[in-house]
Design a protein with these regions (language model features):
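Repeated scaffold domains used in trafficking and secretory/extracellular systems
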Residues: 46-49, 88-96, 140-148, 181-187, ...
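Surface-exposed loop and turn segments in beta-propeller and other repeat-based domains
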Residues: 28-41, 83-87, 125-139, 217-219, ...
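Short loop/turn segments that connect beta-strands within beta-propeller blades
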Residues: 74-78, 119-124, 167-172, 206-211, ...
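Beta-strand-rich domains and repeat architectures in extracellular enzymes and scaffolds
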Residues: 38-67
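Conserved beta-propeller blade signature
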Residues: 57-60, 100-103, 154-156, 192-195, ...
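A short loop-to-beta-strand structural motif that recurs across blades of beta-propeller domains
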Residues: 69-73, 114-118, 162-165, 201-204, ...
Length: 639
């Protein structure tokens, strides 16, 4: 009997040993940067215009939403559906009436650009196309920059045509009103048309026949970006995305005059009521939509700063609802279409830095700050519409003493932008350098891997050099601006060519190199081989141990911290595999611990879409780009 019990215990022990690699240590799935976490409840991506129905139903337009229609519908602080395809709309203008929604359409081979689509609010299908502009070949910029309805009439700003076009809501042209650079529109109770000229800081009034009437001349720095006529008060509300970052209200019963403002003067850049860059109630960024419902609730659509030529990735969705007293009632917020936020070592992983925004918390978290200051730093590359990237929304972060270095990049970048922070500028990321660029004395693109390590050093695989270049951080000046020394090259080990990813962990002097796909010209993809070099700076640049063999298909993004390498995949599974850097073994696969509350998306379709940090408690925090749900997935894992 004793022998039998011993044998049973032995067998049980062997079984435990066999299955141990497949057992999962405890982990949780969470999310940031979206008010809601599931695919059916989430807030839509990058709303750039808004119309509010009298009953309080909100319609927003976006150029792109991966998992729903580009016109999102909300009521009472929740998503209630969407209209159209995910790439059907331009996003820059929307309006409606009791039966229909009118919105600018994205360029299409069938009808080009400059077209408005009419959609039934009940049927949620398109029933009319209205060709507004002679500019039909524009594939990027907004051609139609304003829409409004009044009674049986539809008004449309044809920006390149320098005119406001008037149609019936059935699409029959009535007349044109000549206006240079027309933008947002509103129609008052008498049928007068108000037209914003954003770059000029003016709002023009025309009578119903198109004859000029009054002009509201705002300050030279003002940029009227949204208009709304309040029939109850007979007042015109104008969103200003200039330095004031607020909403201005004008009495238009006679000669227009400014009667009040709504929102903190300076918006998110104000330093008297908060930290510069801090968003929140009445701390507006770009006000791109204003509306009221029949009970007097005010709705404000912000479009946080940050975006290049791809207007589907320009800012994010940020809707505020305010009661009649002016108090905030709720917010609906989402990440830019695609991006990731890196855990901040300076707060032991409590804060997360994206390419343009900062977040904290859990279960959607809190949108803390927009780090782009378009007023003081208009040349910030995150605002450059001619940038090669489609938006610099992927953040990498190093905390060195009291200083932080932020690196922003795109979905599949071969150039990177560097920023610093200081007390005077609060949460604003101050532009410093570009790689490639003068600060690093190179014009070579980064096609063979990039890493900002935890010491602030930079490691880069410069295209065509057959080397891994190390730029050591030499220090910070009095303003917090970092500088780096001359690059020192190390030949790429022959066993890992073509090299595609670099990660260096200075705490353990460990270099991690990932191979691309042998024989392929796609420098953005990862193959199956990852080499781990312990003691790299101590001289071991030739002997990898372990060598990790990735057996799952299509690895795309990797990140590492502590004792683990984390791997995400594209076009296959949303899983994150955790490989042990000492043994090379696959120790865990993170999938979804809370599928009822968190949607983790399909995959990772970005080169640097994973970030990680090991907290002082030993807990690993891994963040993942979730372009399917306009959010950031957060895994917390303790091996």
């Amino acid at each position: 009997m004793i022998k039998k019990n011993i044998f049973t215990i032995f067998v049980a022990a062997m079984l435990i040993a066999v299955i141990a690699p497949h057992c999962q240590a405890a982990y949780t799935s969470d999310w940031l940067a979206n008010t809601f976490g599931t695919n059916t409840t989430r807030v839509g991506s990058v709303a750039r215009s808004m119309w509010v129905a009298p009953e309080g139903v909100i319609y927003t337009a976006s150029m792109w939403d991966e998992n729903e229609g580009g016109v999102a519908i909300y009521a009472n602080g929740k998503s209630i559906g969407s209209i159209g395809g995910h790439g059907e709309f331009q996003g820059g203008a929307i309006t409606g009436n009791a039966t229909s929604i009118f919105t600018a359409l994205q360029y299409n081979a069938a009808y080009g650009s400059g077209t408005v689509g009419r959609y039934g609010r009940t049927s949620q299908t398109r029933d009319l196309l209205i060709s507004v502009s002679a500019t039909t070949a524009e594939k990027r910029a907004d051609v139609i920059t304003g829409l409004a309805t009044s009674g049986s009439l539809l008004y449309a700003s044809d920006f390149p045509g320098n005119r406001v076009r008037v149609y019936t809501t059935a699409g029959v042209w009535q007349r044109d009103i000549n206006v240079s650079g027309p933008g947002a529109l509103a129609v008052d109770g008498a049928g007068n048309i108000w037209v914003a000229q954003k770059s000029a800081g003016t709002i023009l009034e025309f009578d119903p026949t198109g004859r000029p009437r009054n002009t509201i001349q705002m300050s030279t720095a003002s940029r009227p970006s949204a208009l709304y006529f309040d029939a109850t008060t007979v007042q015109l509300m104008a969103g200003d995305e200039g330095p004031d970052m607020n909403i201005k209200t004008y009495n238009i019963s006679g000669t227009p005059c400014l009667v009040s403002t709504f929102g903190i003067q300076g918006g998110y850049l104000d330093t008297t009521t908060g930290i510069k860059g801090q968003v929140g109630a009445k701390r507006f960024t770009r006000v791109v939509g204003i509306g009221k419902d029949a009970t007097g609730n005010l709705y404000v659509l912000n479009n946080p700063w940050g975006g290049t030529w791809d207007l589907g990735r320009d800012g994010g969705t940020d809707i505020h609802s305010y009661g009649r007293s002016g108090s905030l009632q709720w917010k609906l917020q989402s990440l830019n279409f695609e991006g990731v936020a890196a855990p901040d070592p300076g707060t032991d992983g409590a804060y997360f830095y994206g390419g343009t925004n900062i977040y904290t918390g859990s279960a959607g978290g809190t949108f803390v700050a927009n780090t782009v200051d378009a007023i003081d730093y208009p040349s910030d590359p995150r605002l450059n519409i001619n940038d090669l990237g489609r938006g610099e929304h992927f953040g990498q972060l190093a905390a060195v003493g009291a200083n932080r270095i932020l690196v922003a990049g795109g979905q599949d970048p071969d150039n990177f932008y560097f920023f610093h922070f200081n007390a005077a500028n609060g949460y604003i990321a101050i532009p410093d350098a570009t790689l490639p660029g003068a600060a690093f004395n190179t014009a070579a693109r980064i096609r063979e891997g990039f890493c900002l390590d935890s010491n602030g050093d930079v490691w880069a695989g410069l295209d065509g050099t057959n080397a891994i270049w190390h730029y050591a951080l030499t220090g910070f000046d009095a303003s917090g601006k970092p500088t780096w020394g001359a690059g020192i090259p190390t030949p790429i080990p022959g066993t890992i060519k073509p090299l595609t990813r670099i990660i260096y962990l200075p705490e353990s002097d460990t270099m991690i190199l990932a191979q691309g796909i042998v024989g392929s010209t796609d420098w953005t993809s990862i193959g199956s081989r990852v080499e781990v070099y312990h003691g790299w700076r101590a001289g071991n640049t030739t002997t990898a141990n372990p060598v990790i063999n990735i057996t799952s298909a299509n690895p795309k993004s990797i990140t590492a911290t502590g004792n683990y390498l984390f791997v995400g995949y594209v076009h296959t599974v949303p899983n994150i595999d955790a490989f042990n850097l000492n043994t090379g073994s696959l120790d865990a696969t993170l999938t979804n611990s809370s599928p009822d509350t968190v949607y983790v998306g399909n995959d990772v379709d970005s080169m640097y879409g994973l970030r990680s940090y090991r907290r002082t408690t030993g807990e690993y925090v891994i963040t993942k780009d979730n372009y399917n749900a306009s959010s950031v997935v957060v895994y917390r894992w303790t091996p």
